[in-house]
């Protein structure tokens, strides 16, 4: 039987983040007892999402101690994705995590941030159809969720539930992912 200790994840939010993706990730990870920090990459804890939903982050990205964090996650959205890419703490943390074997995940347009950092070179990945051409160096797959080593990508809001369940599986185990899937009545 798999044994999982309390995992920690940071989900980066920025001005213009796709709120459905971002909040779904936070909600399902927290249901799985993953300790999630919502970290603002916009210099303020108060964020306005891509569809004008007001969100309060737990901390600024620059204030988070990443030393015991197991995974960082980048939701998509425009202009959220370029705003994440413009934040040095976000990009430096993604590079550090990817190179040290820690988990990095991105959905929708956000895998383009990982590609711009060279983190998808020689890896399988996916992104929103409008951003697949930005995945330089990657073998692009047009599927909901792609896991290649320590990097997980998804193609967008339509794949957000399977993406979130995959992150739950990675951080809390298959049994917990199955429990969450049943609890939310996701039958796909």
Name every feature range the model reports, one short phrase each:
Residues 45-49, 144-147:
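Short acidic-hydrophobic surface loop/beta-edge motif
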Residues 48-58:
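A cross-family phosphate/adenosyl-ligand binding-site feature
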């Amino acid at each position: 039987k798999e044994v999982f200790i309390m995992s920690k994840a940071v989900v980066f939010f920025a001005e213009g983040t796709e709120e459905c993706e971002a909040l779904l990730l936070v909600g399902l990870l927290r249901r799985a007892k993953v300790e999630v920090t919502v970290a603002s990459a916009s210099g303020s804890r108060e964020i306005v999402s891509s569809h004008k939903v007001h969100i309060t982050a737990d901390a600024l990205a620059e204030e988070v101690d990443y030393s015991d964090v197991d995974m960082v996650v980048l939701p998509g959205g425009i202009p959220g994705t370029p705003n994440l890419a413009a934040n040095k703490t976000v990009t430096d943390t993604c590079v550090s995590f990817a190179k040290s074997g820690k988990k990095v995940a991105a959905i929708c347009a956000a895998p383009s941030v990982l590609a711009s950092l060279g983190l998808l070179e020689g890896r399988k990945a996916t992104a929103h159809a409008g951003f697949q051409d930005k995945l330089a160096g990657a073998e692009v797959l047009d599927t909901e969720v792609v896991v290649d080593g320590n990097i997980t990508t998804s193609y967008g809001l339509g794949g957000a539930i399977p993406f979130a369940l995959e992150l739950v599986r990675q951080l809390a185990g298959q049994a917990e992912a199955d429990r969450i899937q049943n609890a939310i009545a996701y039958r796909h």
